[in-house]
Amino acid sequence: FSYLIAGSLLYRDQRTMSELASAAIGQSTLLAKGATEDQAMAFLQPIVIDTHALNNPWLNYSVYLCNTLFPGILMLLIYLVTAYTIGVEVKENTAKELMHMADNSIVTALVGKLLPQTIIFFIIAVFYNVYLYGFLHYPCNSGIFPMLLAGLLLVLASQAVGIFFFGLFGTLRLALSAASLWGVLSFSISGFTYPVMAMHPTLQALCVLFPLRHYFLLYANLALNGYPLIYAWHSVVALLIFMLLPFFVLKRLRTIMLHYIYIP
């Protein structure tokens, strides 16, 4: 399915047109030489091929595009909003007040700040899933509930990456820049427009570092192919691993919130 990009579909249509034009010339030549129409068709096309595309028989490019583009945009927004939500506390000099309200617990502070956003982002994920599979009737052979679970995992993994970026760089501007870069690269390297197996081996190894890649694999295995969730366990585990990233920067985050001073 990842090969069925717009260029491939256009090439297929143009090739079909050229073959039909060539066949029309050959048919006219055979008819002029006295062959019957049946004899001409049997000579031009002795074997008739009847092909049916699996899981997307309409070859609707939107089916391949929107099911990853929508969550990709949501993921990018989550990166930016999460990093900004934490960084703005330092920028506005309210980080110490937040930590005081959380009894100097960075975990409590992060949960209090980000949990409402998690709920809102998950509602957005539910909305686009219902819109794609319930309203537009895009193929969803596994049922909508596994895709809702995949959406929740993507939301949590994206928030974890946003926290990690701010904890890693320690400044709002660098965290937002890194989040923007990582989010934009996700669209190219996730595999829904260009197959990962055709990429350079280095990029094939790096693609696992992007949450959108694992969400795309979940979509392909669950919604398109209709496999049970157990057969996509590796993608689920990968998204769960992304959720562990904040634990590597918790100590640094606490130091930032308590002691860092924002420099314009």
Where are these regions (language model features)?
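Hydrophobic alpha-helical transmembrane segments of multi-pass membrane transport proteins
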Residues: 52-132
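Membrane-spanning alpha-helical segments of multipass transporters and channels
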Residues: 119, 123, 127-131, 139-264
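Short helix-terminus and kink motifs of transmembrane alpha helices
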Residues: 12, 80-88, 92, 159-167, ...
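Juxtamembrane loop-helix boundary motifs flanking transmembrane segments in multi-pass membrane proteins
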Residues: 41, 50, 54-58, 98-111, ...
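Short, surface-exposed helix/turn micro-motifs that flank interaction/cofactor sites
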Residues: 2, 109-110, 166, 216
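Transport-system extracytoplasmic interface segments
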Residues: 1-81
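Low-complexity, flexible helical/coil segments
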Residues: 18-25, 29-37, 84-91, 109, ...
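Short amphipathic alpha-helical interaction/hinge segments
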Residues: 26-29, 78, 94, 126, ...
